[in-house]
A protein has these predicted regions:
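Short, charged alpha-helical interaction segments and adjacent helix-coil junctions
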Residues: 2-6, 78-83, 184-296
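Conserved single-residue anchors adjacent to enzymatic active/cofactor-binding motifs
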Residues: 1-221
């Protein structure tokens, strides 16, 4: 959770992510982050921000939003999602998002040629997500890449959909100087930027990111938006914590599972009443569209 006395934003918080990576003025920062996790032959040279709203994306048929969406000069689509706590079926949700964007690309195709450009989804994960990880194979690994490939040979026939998970909770290097390569440096900075103090140390290659994320340097309008997002984020955090405690109390009285379910229901009701989009409520509570509909 961000504080009012820190110098830099937290890129993994909703308010910090919007202020740093969703601002077109900070496009070079976003390009640097994407290139740190993309394969060397898939580098981004330039990009344009695209609408985050995707018509008909939810199972309820309503428009929804991803955290960030952009297109590069070659027409490839990129989605960036930040997830700070585990949620049910997150892997499937990412596949669904990327598939929908890929399907929308067919509209630009020529007749039945299906000349559809690739889609990349990069998910920044701040907590353990329960992925099946064999310690003998995943020791020291925190970036995983998924795509369509032939099972026996591993051959990729064509570039279609790629999903990249950056599991920041698995990244354990404590000092910036311990990092080897851009991917590790970016992982360290994403986790620790909000704790840094100006002039305490030098971080080669991240001068632009630090300048863009310095709260005192925000314009009056941007600072007002950032503060409003911070308040909303704290309110949602307090709602979740309160509901969790209420759910635990009810769980002691009527069974833990039932209590947790009631807690989630109360959280969802409060979020919907505050005007939060249904997709965001589902993401934060784990409830389905049908369950939300029953609360109205």
């Amino acid at each position: 959770m961000e504080t009012s006395i820190q110098t830099y934003v937290n890129p993994l918080s909703d308010a910090g992510f919007k202020a740093l990576l969703c601002d077109p003025a900070n496009k070079p920062v976003l390009i640097g982050m994407l290139n740190a996790f993309l394969p060397p032959d898939r580098m981004v040279e330039d990009l344009e921000y695209a609408t985050t709203e995707i018509p008909g994306l939810t199972l309820a048929g309503k428009a929804s939003r991803v955290d960030l969406r952009c297109t590069d000069t070659r027409g490839r689509s990129f989605i960036v999602e930040v997830q700070r706590s585990p949620q049910p079926n997150f892997f499937r949700r990412c596949v669904y998002y990327a598939s929908r964007i890929y399907a929308l690309g067919a509209r630009r195709g020529d007749g039945q040629r299906y000349d559809i450009l690739p889609v990349y989804l990069v998910a920044l994960l701040d907590r353990g997500f329960g992925f099946r990880r064999d310690p003998s194979e995943w020791e020291g690994r925190y970036v995983s890449r998924y795509t369509f490939r032939e099972k026996e040979t591993g051959q990729v026939e064509d570039e279609t959909i790629s999903i990249i998970f950056v599991e920041l909770d698995r990244f354990g290097k404590e000092e910036f100087g311990e990092c080897a390569g851009a991917a590790e440096e970016w992982c360290w900075m994403l986790k620790n930027m909000w704790r840094l103090q100006p002039g305490a140390a030098e971080y080669p290659g991240f001068e632009g990111m630090l300048a863009a994320g310095e709260i005192a340097g925000f314009s009056k309008e941007k600072r007002a938006k950032y503060d409003a997002d911070m308040i909303t984020e704290r309110d949602m955090y307090n709602i979740l914590e309160t509901a969790k405690k209420e759910g635990e109390a009810k769980g002691r009285e009527a069974g833990l599972a039932e209590g947790e379910a009631k807690g989630k229901t109360e959280v969802a009701k409060n979020m919907l009443a505050s005007g939060m989009p249904e997709e965001q409520v589902m993401a934060m509570t784990g409830l389905t569209a049908e369950q939300l509909a029953a609360l109205k």
